[in-house]
Amino acid sequence: MKPFVLVLFALLALLQYRLWFGENSLTEYFTLKDRISHQQSGNAELLERNEVLKEEIQDLKSGTEALEERARNELGLIEQGETFFRVVGNDSRSIRSSEQSQDNQ
């Protein structure tokens, strides 16, 4: 009976070793599960981006409004009868120099 128990104990130890440290172990399982989760979230982001691009392509193919908007933003399109205003941001040096000139007067 004692040799039988020793064989069962050795078999149990071997199976436990393979479960925790061997090929296809639990650590590999959890690592793969984590990688799959990250990959699925990345895929979801890319699918969303693809949908936005598909909608933009469809809009550019079917309508002139999107094409005109893109030409205005990227190429500076101005139609006849429109007035173009360029808003220049405040430069801190020009503000200080104008304040100093007002102080001198």
Curated annotation (Swiss-Prot):
Compartments where found: Cell inner membrane
Cell division found in the keyword field: yes
Segments on the Cytoplasmic face: 1-3
Protein name: Cell division protein FtsB
Biological-process GO terms, alphabetical: FtsZ-dependent cytokinesis
Keyword Coiled coil among UniProt keywords: yes
Subunit text: Part of a complex composed of FtsB, FtsL and FtsQ.
Transmembrane residue ranges: 4-21
HAMAP family xrefs: FtsB
GO cellular component term, pick one: cell division site
Pfam families membership: DivIC (PF04977)
Signal peptide: none
Gene, per the UniProt record: ftsB
InterPro entries on file: Cell_div_FtsB, FtsL/DivIC
Chief site of localization: membrane
Membrane topology: Single-pass type II membrane protein
Ranges in a coiled coil: 38-75
Functional description taken from the UniProt entry: Essential cell division protein. May link together the upstream cell division proteins, which are predominantly cytoplasmic, with the downstream cell division proteins, which are predominantly periplasmic.
Organism, as annotated: Shewanella amazonensis (strain ATCC BAA-1098 / SB2B)
